[in-house]
Swiss-Prot record:
InterPro entries: KOW (IPR005824), Rib_uL2_dom2 (IPR014722), Ribosomal_uL24 (IPR003256), Ribosomal_uL24_CS (IPR005825), Ribosomal_uL24_KOW (IPR041988), Translation_prot_SH3-like_sf (IPR008991). This is Large ribosomal subunit protein uL24. PANTHER family: MITOCHONDRIAL RIBOSOMAL PROTEIN L24 (PTHR12903). Belongs to the universal ribosomal protein uL24 family. NCBIfam families: rplX_bact. One of its GO terms (biological process) is translation. One of two assembly initiator proteins, it binds directly to the 5'-end of the 23S rRNA, where it nucleates assembly of the 50S subunit. One of the proteins that surrounds the polypeptide exit tunnel on the outside of the subunit. GO terms for cellular component: cytosolic large ribosomal subunit.
Length: 103
């Protein structure tokens, strides 16, 4: 399946506690999950590691969110949009389905 959402894409969250928030994709995992900057923040309890000089305690981290729960953000329409693929000049390109503009 082609990657409709890629790293550095601006996305909007469709479901969950962060619904409606926008952010940039920082990492895409092969299992269909994405990390979005500032979205799905969790608190982890980490143990100290004296050998590495790492202090323990509560650490806030971004957790992965399923790619089906985010949609690419179209800045022209200011809304979430769907992604299509087509060939232009022998290259496969992504485009917004609402206005046929290349991403």
């Amino acid at each position: 399946m082609p990657a409709k959402i890629r790293q550095n894409d601006e996305v909007i969250v469709l479901t969950g506690k962060d619904k409606g928030k926008r952010g940039k994709v920082t990492k895409v995992l092969p299992n269909g999950k994405v990390f979005v900057e500032g979205i799905n923040i969790i608190t982890k309890h980490e143990k100290p590691v004296p050998a590495l000089g790492k202090a323990g305690g509560l650490v806030k981290k971004e957790a992965a969110i399923d790619a089906s729960n985010v949609a690419i953000f179209n800045p022209k329409t200011n809304k979430a949009d769907r992604v299509g693929f087509r060939f232009e000049d022998g290259k496969k390109v992504r485009f917004f389905k609402s206005n046929n503009e290349i991403i």
